[in-house]
């Protein structure tokens, strides 16, 4: 049975985040930027190639990961999250920069985060070229930190995936997540006040989808890609679909990992779908699903 906990009550407003994006749109687009509001911003390198860039923060997951001795997972999260965003436009990752901002510098803590990020970068063939470490007493409380990263990739203009060719009847292929990944932890921590959870998928690092995306592109015509982060499956698919088209999701077409069954005891179904990936970490819109798990259709 769904409970009463919501993301808003936990201190995070997705509606306000959406409003901020729209408020900033004119200023950002006035600089000549392409792809504002997409998973990755685009910059023309020359007539044939585009740079794709994405930046994100790990949010409040480190607060829980540190308590359980799994801070390294958050470094892996951050690298995978940014690389996954860049993949959505068809780009290959080139390099990553990281930003670590704790209340006070802790060598072991910084090393865990950067080593976790480096492990994912090695797997992706993406260079970790540098970053910034800032000690910010007075900004964060004792023991608190922020960890962010920026990934830059490269895509040939002819290979760009932007959702423009999506048509009614196209299939939505769902790729499984490793667990909660890196979104919704303010709400997770609120639920933990009522009931503990020890399963590995709660703090498992974000899955890297590079090999999956490459395989899909070899096997079938990929028309859009969505990284399922804050906003859930439907919210993130809507970011890559042409105006007037929607994704009808069959929520019974896959089995949810146990961590989401635990959350469902405290969070209403609509809120679960709006905040969490619910076991689907990445979506591809394709004409032919090529034997993959279909979780919905475009209409």
Predicted regions and their residues:
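Glycine-/charge-enriched secondary-structure boundary and capping motifs
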Residues: 2-11, 20, 26, 108-127, ...
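Glycine-rich phosphate/pyrophosphate-binding loop regions near the starts of catalytic domains
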Residues: 23-178
